[in-house]
Amino acid sequence: MSIRFIYGRAGSGKSLFCINQIKKLIDSDKEKKIILLVPEQYTFTTENKVLNYIGERAFLNTHVLSFRTMCQKVFEECGGRVKQIIKDTGKHMLINKVLNEKIDDLSYFKKMSREQGFNNIISELITEFKKYNINIDALRDLTDKIDDNELVEKIRELSLIYEEFNVKMHSSYIDTDDELTLLAKKLLANNIYANSEIWIDEFTTFTPQQLEIIRILSKASVVNITLCMDKIENSDVEDITNVFSSIENTENRLLKLMEENNIGYLNPINLNSKLPYRFKNSEELSHIEKYCITYPFKSYKGKNKDVRLYKANNTYDEIEKVAKDIIRLVRDRNYRFRDISVVCRNIENYNKIISVIFNDYEIPFFMDQKIKLLNNPLIVLITSAFEVVLKNWSYESVFKYLKSGLTGFNIYDIDRLENFVLEHGIKSYKWNEEEIEKLKNIKIENGATEDELTIFNLMEEVRNSLISFHKLIEGKHYVRDICKALYEFLLSIKAFERIDEWIIKFEELKLEDKVKEYKQVESIVIDMLDQAVEVMGSDVVDTFEFFKILNSGFENEEIGVIPVALDQVNVGDIARIKGREVKALYIVGINDGILPAAHKDEGILSDRDRIELKEFGIVLAADGRSKAFEEQFVVYTALTIASEYLMLSYPMADFEGKSLRPSIIISRIKKILPNLVEESSLYDLSKRSDHFNKVISPIPTFNELIFALRRELEDEDIDEEYWGEVYNWFKENEDFKWKIENTFKGLRYSNTGEKVSRNKLLSLYKNDLGKLSFSVSRLEKYAECPFSYFIQYGLKAKNRKVYEFTPPDLGSFVHDILDSFTNKVKKEKIAWSDLDMIKCKNIVSELIDTKLKEDSGSILNSTNKYKYFSKRFKRVISKSVSVISEQMRRGEFEVFNNEFSFGSYNDGEAIVLELPSNEKVYLNGRIDRIDTLDLEGSTYLRIVDYKTGNKHFDLNQFYYGLQMQLLVYLDALIKNSEYILKKQALPGAVLYFKVDDPIIKTKGDITTEELEKEVLSNLKMNGLILKDAKVVKAMDRGIETDGYSLVIPAALKKDGDFKAGSEVVTEEQFTLLREYVNKKMIDLCEDMLCGDIKIQPTKDSDGSHCEFCDFSSICQFDSSIEDNKYKIIMKKSKDEIWNNIRDELNDDKKEN
């Protein structure tokens, strides 16, 4: 018999020609058997075409098949597989088995073979070998011919794996990749298609397996093959840069097959001689088809009406524009949704946003994409049940298991359990029965609540359900036993029953996609376990090995879906759009590197390897360079699929705001269609032509109405006059009536804290003794944001407790150790000058060890991680105290006291603030260290506050009430110095000291002395110092000789005056600061009690308080709302701050 080629470029009517010829054959010979062979993904649409053009009678003797369905049909009629077919999951398991057995024979792939996903790579390569008829002998013969040692090693080991795989496979099973080989044998033995008419359409290329089927069919039948090409002339020279190169290559291979097998060559049909059928109604689209890949090209001179180009701000803007345009086509131009398709090259980046927006716009659509099973709750349940044992009962694995929704525990109990587990750090061995019982007894001794006892019972239920399963799978077991244990575990927790219940709910909600997914997932899991038993049942593996095999199978499982309705917009990948009748096409995401797609992953066999193998007659799939030019054909197909209307779009930024560049396709189209206007949100042609362009479907129209109302409230001009009628429509509509009312409330909504009565606030803030007792840090928090303060200290809101070592915990720990260190030095009468690094290290180590021993339940004793932290803290604190000792050694100040508390009635009385409203506020606090100096009959005070973070004194922050602590402490000590020191004191300095072990960066070698100086400089105290050279020199003797200090922020000129940059203030200025801080505290307290709970976070050049606030979800501060404004901390000069302080104090004195 013979083969005939049907040539035609895109849109020339090749598929229609085939169907018309089939119709003529049916009319002339009703008994003639006809086969229409198309790619698998096009069978459904092709059957619809045949049904529409010919009618039901076509299917009496005409069969629309793919190569796979041809296998099934032939095997049904002639008998076929005598062995069980192995699925992809079983194939991966078999490959895993081969790799484990042959691991010692591998060198190149030995390490690689243990990596996750390697099985998939080998599976794909074996499939490729079979599709291209590459046998083991052909691979082995190469090892003596190739000079590339690395490639020889790859081929040798691949041959070994390939051979062993085939031996194990063919002993009991048949691979889906072998089906076409078996089909060829059946067709040769059973001439079932003799005298048939075969039509092959929509193929770009054929694998050697498929070519063999075509060869056999053409021996007994007439075979017609469509080729998407623009010429009939044959060329022996392959030009891969030609967009039709892959088709031409297919043609050459078919001609060679015909020549070698003496197959007749019928006169070809050329459909390129007339105007393309598809574009009979659109000159623009016809012009694009003709010149989008042609060099040189001609520009289209006509008026543009069928092509649009849209530059979107982002993907949301892009898809919303597409949705609006689809509605326009359906509403104004009488399109059906089924006439429209939306395609892109990266559907996984668009599927969610398309689903959301199309549902809002009430556009029915079919997402032509397979569903990945890895995130299905049943799969999550199974993988997490294994992860619990493999990850030793980690928090993540336990709650991943519980939150799968299939364990039988209700979400309220799971949430309570999660809070309890986080609070007590329950993970790993703490899930042991003994540890839980120990914690339970401690709770009972301390008066456990009923809620806590319920949680312990819940923990026991969780443990029991998993422990019984883990006992059956831990260690090494036969695969069949692990599969049985897993299946029985799923039955015991009634997972399948809950899946069935969900399916019923999905059916009630008409969620067809979910129904299909959940109906299939159960059978997929059981099939996978069956495959595991069939393939590896007698193999002994450990839990991790089995989990790897199982997880690999789940990663590759996908569920195919078919359209549930006829009138839907088709959404999918560009590569799957062929074969459809599309009147209007939207191509989205036309960005550089995305369309055309960039092929980077070469796999085990690189492009170079494939080219070298091709030289020795081993032809495999296309290399990266060829794929790049094949991608041009994909682009050509996409641009030419629409018959009436084409809209191209690209976003300028992705979801993260990262800028994107337009594809080269955009510039090409602009040149071909010079009259094409690039639209955007700023220049939208539809707004000019459609006065009602914002009135679309109810939800988006409702959103536009809200924007219009918002603009009106803000006194902006509104061009549209129809919003009043739109508002009335929504007001009368039952579905939107309540929404419109709530929205109006929202538009008038003022996000401000409600006024709270003074009495209520007093009752909230007073302590158990009925006093208003605050710390200075609390007042600073109020200055940062009044509302945040009210939530934390008024309503007593707290974060979920988590068993972790937080920065505040570190601060308390460091303060305790430094306090103990100072007390030990004082008690044992050790002079600071006698402390060196070794002594400091020994004392600190002893203090920390003692503290951790006394507090056996400390988190620092819990895990190796925290034990390492405690060692690190020893190093940091040792370095810090050695620096403190050096600072004390360099000066004349002496430590008077440390951890001095006022307001606790142990060291000193509270600071009392008398408010204008006659309430008294008692301030309490703790001073880390008080140093004193007796000089020339006067006593000077130095306040030192230890900080574990980067805290620097900022006069600007002090002015706004955000850094008051040091000055409050200084004022309290000076006012009470007669009582505390037994003599009047003067201000010397207020300083922060950072507790740290700094890393010193150097350029080359450094001496020990230089290193010590660098450390001192890095840990130099910062704050304010009295502008008195004698006092400053008493803090650091070295300043006199060096001119600068390594201890304090001060430097002296040669004449004894202070250099610029020295943080010094006069005694009078210290007095001003003390007076101002008292005034500021009174103002803040009075403001706090007035009842106006302002949502007013502070903001400066470094950011806003909201960035670190735990309560931002409560206040919902939004700077776009008129009433929500930041309290801006303006950066003022020092002179301006001093002038403001003086002015405010003077004004205050005048008022009083």
From Swiss-Prot:
Keywords: 4Fe-4S, ATP-binding, DNA damage, DNA repair, DNA-binding, Exonuclease, Helicase, Hydrolase, Iron, Iron-sulfur, Metal-binding, Nuclease, Nucleotide-binding. One of its GO terms (molecular function) is helicase activity. Pfam families: ADDB_N (PF21445), PDDEXK_1 (PF12705). ATP binds at G8, R9, A10, G11, S12, G13, K14, S15. Gene3D superfamilies: 3.90.320.10, 6.10.140.1030, P-loop containing nucleotide triphosphate hydrolases. Binds 1 [4Fe-4S] cluster. Residues 276-579 form the UvrD-like helicase C-terminal domain. Its EC number is 3.1.-.-. [4Fe-4S] cluster binds at C785, C1106, C1109, C1115. Residues 1-338 form the UvrD-like helicase ATP-binding domain. Signal peptide: none annotated. Heterodimer of AddA and AddB. Despite having conserved helicase domains, this subunit does not have helicase activity. The heterodimer acts as both an ATP-dependent DNA helicase and an ATP-dependent, dual-direction single-stranded exonuclease. Recognizes the chi site generating a DNA molecule suitable for the initiation of homologous recombination. The AddB subunit has 5' -> 3' nuclease activity but not helicase activity. HAMAP family: AddB_type1. NCBIfam families: addB_Gpos. This is ATP-dependent helicase/deoxyribonuclease subunit B. The lineage of its organism: Bacteria, Bacillati, Bacillota, Clostridia, Eubacteriales.
